[in-house]
Amino acid sequence: MKKNLIKKCAVAAAACAVMAAGVGYYYFFSSMSKDGETHYVYVDDDDNIDSVYTKLSDVSASHSLAAFKLLTNATSYASHVRTGRYAIEPSTGALQTFRHMRNGQQTPVNLTVPSVRTLDKLAELSKRLMVDSADIAKALTSEATCEKYGYDTATIACMFIPNTYDIYWNTSVERLLDRMQKESKRFWEGDRTVKAQQMKLT
């Protein structure tokens, strides 16, 4: 009798463990995307945890959002919200999404520099970034800023090589210009004549 009772208790405990594991998997590891599609959540520098929840609720399954909130309550994320563009993918659960957002592991955007590089066109790059177009325009018309990169306000547009770049959505104006300077130097290494022909400068 006693052995049977122990056996039944062991079976019940095992069943409970399996159920708990199943529930845990469902909440923390099953797809967070509410419709099986990839979505992006943009966290601005004026967002707080409540606005993050609101943005997540538009693209997340309810059980995954509940799990995300549990993880938030168990950590200090609410007071350390990090800006960025975060992917909510079909293969990503609440736990992985939470880790990405807590650690600032965002998904870059494809930023295309047009072949027509007027200052107004370059300021429009802000449409793909968190920065404001006025901030980009201010930097490109600043003699001090242009001089820092070896240009003046009339030639700074030449630093922007037409191409598509992977860049983080929350990149600052300074980091954007640093990246463009790096890409420009890389482009012009080697045969300058060939590169100039590619750019239709000769």
List where the protein language model places each region.
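Conserved catalytic or metal-liganding residues and their short signature motifs at active sites
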Residues: 1-202
